[in-house]
Amino acid sequence: MKRTFTAKKFALVGTAIAVPLIAAAQISLGGIDRAPQAKKQHVELLTDALQLTANKPQDIELRFRVEPGFHINSHTPKDELLIPTILKLDSGSLHIADEQYPPGQHFRLQVGSGEDLDVYQGEFRVMIRVEAPKGATTLTGTLRYQACDTAACFPARTLPVQIAVAAR
């Protein structure tokens, strides 16, 4: 029995193969319905107020949470091409020193290269040493990060940091 492929059959087979490949490529490159995710903050600041002893250096923690299903690169990612998470604080009337980032968690990509990453997921804390004069002030700054899910990484974002500080 001789089988012949008509143009119609060939087009159907080609479409059956091409559509999943194109869809997979778009998903891995973040091309399908990713625009809303790219504009969204995937990290939130959990610390909103600090009570300190005036004129005494103290270690405090700034708590952040990464949205479930996402991760961000650690402060020291394994690849120099990856965007690190960086906290920049404006000292104002506060004396700030010794930022200490947590170690990243091991994470293996399930798509693409399958490379190992050093990331933050869930809740993480950055420790800082602060000395505040007596009174009320606001600790301000930014957290710069790049959020990724299992299929794509999104443009780097900057999260504003604003924390009320009362020193007595």
Predicted segment positions?
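Bacterial N-terminal signal peptides that target proteins for export
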Residues: 2-17
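Hydrophobic h-region of N-terminal signal peptides that target proteins for export
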Residues: 16-25
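Extracellular/lumen-exposed scaffold segments
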Residues: 25-168
